[in-house]
Amino acid sequence: ADIWSRAGASPDQLYCELGPGRGTLAKDALRSMARFGLSPQVHFVEGSPVLRALQAEAVPGAQFHEDVASLPEDRPLLLVANEFFDALPVRQLVRTDAGWRERMIGLDDGGLDDAGQGEDAFRFVAGDQPMDSAVPEGWADQPPGTIIETCPAAAAVMGEIARRLAEQGGVALIVDYGHLRHRTGSTLQAVAQHR
């Protein structure tokens, strides 16, 4: 609301949230904005039908999008992304004696039986295609076995956000976790029921 006031308090704003979870942050933000006389159109970028149902309950009238690119382009954005980028898929690269390769899941030599079972049936393998051009600057000469992660989707989404802000005006508040510098190692983990 403060930024909206400083920008001239235009009534034509879009509140856009990327990955709004259950809609709680949006509901709270909209309640605060209303105290300043701001009632923007609400647009959520969310792919999960289950979460869309919860968000529609929390913020009736919200419009849903699969992608940032489909958001309206006719007015300034108030864009919020809370832990959105953390949820995007990563691509793992592993340094081999032959250079950088994508780290993939493959079958052990024993493979699977007819029922799809097998002891230690899956393992990480290095892909066949060179991936040296996907390695961030300054990381090419790491020792074999080094793993790094990249997120091509993050760059694409951020590029679209930047383009929209430059053309439409507005502001983005992005809250995410990360490191100032690239780190090596795998962050992949399996999570079920928040464990």
Name these PLM-found stretches.
Residues 1-74:
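SAM cofactor-binding core of SAM-dependent methyltransferases
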Residues 72-195:
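Class I S-adenosyl-L-methionine
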